[in-house]
Amino acid sequence: MQTKPNILLIYTGGTIGMIKDFETGVLKAFNFKKLLQKIPELKHLDCNIETISFKKPIDSSNINPEKWVEIAEIIEKSYADFDGFVVLHGSDTMSYSASALSFMLENLNKPVVFTGSQLPIGDLRTDAKENLITAIQIASLQQKGKSVIHEVCLYFEYKLYRGNRTTKINAEHFNAFASPNYPQLAESGVHLNVNSNLILPKQSTKKLVVHKNLDGNVMIVKMFPGINELVLSAIISIPNLKGIILETYGSGNATTDDWFVNILRKAIKSGLHIINVTQCSGGSVNMGQYETSSQLKKIGVISGKDITTEAAITKLMYLLGQNVAPAVFKTIFETSLRGEMA
């Protein structure tokens, strides 16, 4: 007789964990140990559920690499005892966290599903129940006793995405996330339809490796008409700065002004890693397609291809934390490690 999957619910904070005090109207933190009382539907799921919470749940605006390590360590310590993990997280930075965890959890052979909500769990119109119930169902999916999904995902409003391909696109709608450059992994309707051919392949029998060193000496710089030499020079000169995500126009284009190219050339020669990521919501960087990007290619700017900004900055933190040799850094960044780029 096949045993039920064991699922660990990890509550970090966020709107999903709030409940409205109907007397005062104030949102207050919800005790997740009493989860079954508030969502009795969970009793009908074909899995065993346990919960764990941050000692001090946080608003996702306060998430940082130290908190990512905390999530990773919870998964690491519980990995042998559970078949899947659901991380409850505020939606504002969920794509950053899902991207970071995808790089930190090497050889992952179990599902880690991030989810949250736009309305609190106690609100009459909440999207929290559907997101939570379906995320748990997805984490429980098995074939012949093995997990169907073995990567870090994000589930929101009927759709499951690869975590490091997502970005938040709306502050108010329930359909708050998108995966512009990679199809959805699954969709929930009358049936739960999984696109198995799109899921990352199982990592054979390799042991889970949890990478906990992330280097935060990085920055995101967005190109805009009027960016000036004084400001960019000041940014490049920040002490201990090791990498920049440069959000460029279109397919990787930027101003061809001599001062701009010279600043970047000097920075790259000094060891600074500069990654070219499009500021468009979809599409890919293709340096050399236009004159306005050919100079960037010549001076050694790294192509982010079709990576999201969220995945780019967390991948940069991860690779810097691994002390990747400068000679191979560009090659490794331009290589897909966890399905984050084409």
What are the functions of these language-model segments?
Residues L88-K110, T256-I263, T292:
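Short Gly/Thr/Asp-enriched flexible loops that form oxyanion-binding sites at enzyme active sites
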Residues F114-G189:
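Internal gly/pro-rich beta-alpha loop/helix module
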Residues G13-G14, V86, A135, Y158, ...:
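Buried hydrophobic positions in well-ordered alpha/beta secondary-structure cores of metabolic enzymes
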Residues M18-I19, T93-A98, N131-L132, N253-T255:
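Short glycine/serine/threonine-rich phosphate/pyrophosphate-binding segments
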Residues K4, I10-G14, F32-K43, R162-S251, ...:
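Accessory alpha-helical/coil subdomains and C-terminal extensions
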Residues T12-G14, G90-S91, S117-P120, Y249-G250, ...:
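Short, ordered loop/turn segments at secondary-structure junctions
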Residues S251-A342:
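C-terminal non-catalytic interaction/assembly regions of soluble proteins
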Residues M1-K77:
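ATP/NTP phosphate-donor binding region
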